[in-house]
Amino acid sequence: MELLHSINDFNEAKQVIAGGVNSPVRAFKSVKGTPPFILKGKGAYLYDVDNNHYIDFVQSWGPLIFGHADEEIEENIINALKKGTSFGAPTELETTLAKEIISCYEGLDKVRLVSSGTEATMSAIRLARAYSQKDDLIKFEGCYHGHSDSLLVKAGSGCATFGSPSSLGVPNDFSKHTLVARYNDLNSTEECFKKGNVGCVIIEPIAGNMGLVPAQKEFLLGLKALCEKYQAVLILDEVMSGFRASLSGSQEFYGVVPDLVTFGKVIGAGLPLACFGGRAEIMDLLSPIGSVYQAGTLSGNPLAVCAGLSALYKIKRDKTLYTRLDALAIRLTQGLQKSAQNYNIALETLNMGSMFGFFFNENAVHDFDDALKSDTEMFAKFHQKMLFKGVYLACSSFETGFICEPMTEEMIDLTIAKADESFDEIIKGV
């Protein structure tokens, strides 16, 4: 396999795009490689400008539960496009999508559509602070909630990948109201409550940006109880896990009903769409009813709404979808772990529905400190081997992988075989 055209494209991109990419992890810096420049995707496969094809376990970082260029979703988007790209005015489809989202999630009375996960979490926090009339926020080490200033404190994902605990350009005044607790640690969390005037707590119930690290059930239930004790608004960030791990996101596994929740990725089916929502008494503080301001030129744009609605309709029609995706994820993670064991390579794997992760680590990972103990050099070697064998994995050990509906057992078994070859070559120093 060669990447000559991609190398040339990347060099050209770096002349006019900061870093050559429009989101940092895409640069492949942590795996010491050159990112393939993608020409197209179809089903479970990506095709690059060098005529290589890959089994794609990234799926645009999660949105494409039905894979690339799904015919039904694609046709509906094209039909919507013929009517106009954006109106800046209400449409019936927005109401229909809102109803579909609300019907899947307990405790959700109303939603507001936005264009990105960052907008959703930023707006939810503003709303929660207004409702609680308290300024301080608790977040958790390794949880990533977008790149708004107050949340870039000990975030996972790109910040972890590049070894920076935060970001330059964020004034101390922006982050001084952000308290950071240890994931899956109630004692650490309550200490934060005691330190500040906490108005809200935001958490990924299934963390996907320090690798895949699910919350322990007793921790999430305890967190809900602490929020009630200290009269703080609980925000579940399900931008990644919503409609991915299950139809009801994390609620399938934990049964926790938050005050506010954020969704993204799957609800836009690959187009820019996210939302936040919750109890009516909180949501009604939003302008134009209340005095909490939030707005967006392209919020609820008809193309993204149409794509998301098409995906949700397909999901709800397919009664065995999540069962099949979960089975494939289990087949993959168990196969990878068995292969690594054959070569005495320490590897921890897990999945939550169609989300999966693996760490080159001796022990199970429960928090950010555990994740940071992973062998990132081994990950980089493995990633590069797999890429050149036609398997496209997330290019950071602090990211999550995804199964999509077009994938088959044969694709999974081929991936495991390629992993076996890769481990063999790594051990032999080839």
UniProtKB/Swiss-Prot annotation:
According to its UniProt record, this protein's enzyme class is isomerase
Q: Which SUPFAM superfamilies match?
A: PLP-dependent transferases
Per the record, the pathway is: Porphyrin-containing compound metabolism; protoporphyrin-IX biosynthesis; 5-aminolevulinate from L-glutamyl-tRNA(Glu): step 2/2
Question: PTM N6-(pyridoxal phosphate)lysine: at which residues?
Answer: 265
InterPro entries associated with the record:
4pyrrol_synth_GluAld_NH2Trfase, Aminotrans_3, Aminotrans_3_PPA_site, PyrdxlP-dep_Trfase, PyrdxlP-dep_Trfase_major, PyrdxlP-dep_Trfase_small
GO MF assignments = glutamate-1-semialdehyde 2,1-aminomutase activity; pyridoxal phosphate binding; transaminase activity
- What is the annotated signal peptide range for this record? none
One GO CC term, this protein:
cytoplasm
Looking up NCBIfam families in the UniProt record yields: hemL, PRK00062.1
Family (UniProt) = Belongs to the class-III pyridoxal-phosphate-dependent aminotransferase family. HemL subfamily.
Q: What is this protein called?
A: Glutamate-1-semialdehyde 2,1-aminomutase
The source organism is: Helicobacter pylori (strain ATCC 700392 / 26695) (Campylobacter pylori)
Lineage of this protein's species?
Bacteria, Pseudomonadati, Campylobacterota, Epsilonproteobacteria, Campylobacterales
